[in-house]
């Protein structure tokens, strides 16, 4: 991750719920009340990059620093805002992770779930969440490796498989703004996306039932990966492909 890393910028722009600990003049526009103050205990969502700063900086400590920059820092009072637990880390999601991490649709919960989790863990030094996310990634990485190692792009079927997967990902991206029933909602129509992409690519008529079934199963799983996992799949797939090419020489 770096300053110009697009994924990191998108992660920091993810909105998280906050509660204001003070009444602050002139910020009413944040809740569509221009010219009005934002009231104490008001709850709204702010991008992570802003909420993180406001949750660390305390109003009293800032005033003390302005009056005497050399003064030793004391308790400092409350921070400007209190970060509330996002839906993506709610008990419902955590329980789903513990129950069956492989079937969880991380992309539907948040396309940058794992990157957000790392930032949240670092912010609160949350060891419990860290262990849960570690087990989640370990379980899913093994399955990602299985799918990445079983696909060959050196055959006609492999090329059509890749084409069908890309079509499914594009269809998923186009439907990303559709309503969902909450953070645990899976992407409705994943199976239909797979079938439609397979039909468009000609897989259904050119390969056996077993290969078509494998395509459907693997595509359903890959559509549930968040952006970090998709990059992991791509890197793993390319590594296996290059190794097979080298061995076949």
Curated annotation (Swiss-Prot):
Keywords: DNA replication, Nucleus. The keyword Transmembrane does not apply. Its main location: nucleus. It is found in: Nucleus. Residues 177-209 are annotated as: Disordered. Residues 187-209 have a biased composition (Polar residues). GO terms for cellular component: CMG complex; GINS complex; nuclear replication fork. One of its GO terms (biological process) is double-strand break repair via break-induced replication. Pfam families: PSF3_N, Sld5. InterPro entries: GINS_A (IPR021151), GINS_bundle-like_dom_sf (IPR036224), GINS_Psf3 (IPR010492), GINS_Psf3_sf (IPR038437), PSF3_N (IPR055221). Component of the GINS complex which is a heterotetramer of SLD5, PSF1, PSF2 and PSF3. Belongs to the GINS3/PSF3 family. The GINS complex plays an essential role in the initiation of DNA replication. This is DNA replication complex GINS protein PSF3. It comes from Candida glabrata (strain ATCC 2001 / BCRC 20586 / JCM 3761 / NBRC 0622 / NRRL Y-65 / CBS 138) (Yeast).
């Amino acid at each position: 991750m770096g300053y110009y890393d697009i994924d990191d910028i998108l992660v920091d722009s993810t909105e998280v719920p906050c509660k204001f600990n003070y009444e602050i003049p002139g910020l009413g526009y944040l809740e569509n009340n221009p010219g009005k103050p934002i009231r104490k205990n008001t709850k709204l969502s702010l991008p992570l990059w802003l909420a993180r700063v406001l949750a660390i900086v305390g109003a009293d400590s800032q005033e003390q620093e302005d009056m005497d920059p050399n003064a030793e820092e004391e308790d400092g009072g409350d921070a400007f805002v209190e970060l509330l637990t996002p839906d993506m880390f709610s008990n419902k999601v955590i329980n789903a992770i513990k129950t069956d991490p492989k079937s969880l649709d991380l992309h539907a919960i948040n396309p940058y779930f794992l990157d957000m989790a790392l930032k949240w863990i670092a912010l609160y030094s949350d060891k419990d969440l860290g262990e849960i996310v570690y087990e989640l990634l370990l379980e899913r990485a093994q399955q990602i490796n299985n799918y990445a190692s079983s696909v060959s792009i050196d055959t006609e079927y492999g090329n059509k498989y890749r084409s069908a997967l890309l079509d499914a990902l594009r269809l998923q991206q186009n439907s990303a703004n559709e309503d969902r029933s909450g953070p645990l909602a899976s992407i409705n129509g994943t199976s239909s996306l797979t079938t439609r992409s397979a039909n468009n690519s000609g897989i259904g008529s050119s390969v056996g039932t077993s290969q078509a079934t494998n395509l459907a199963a693997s595509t359903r799983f890959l559509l549930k990966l968040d952006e970090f996992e998709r990059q992991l799949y791509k890197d793993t797939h390319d590594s296996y492909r290059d190794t097979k090419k080298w061995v076949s020489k």
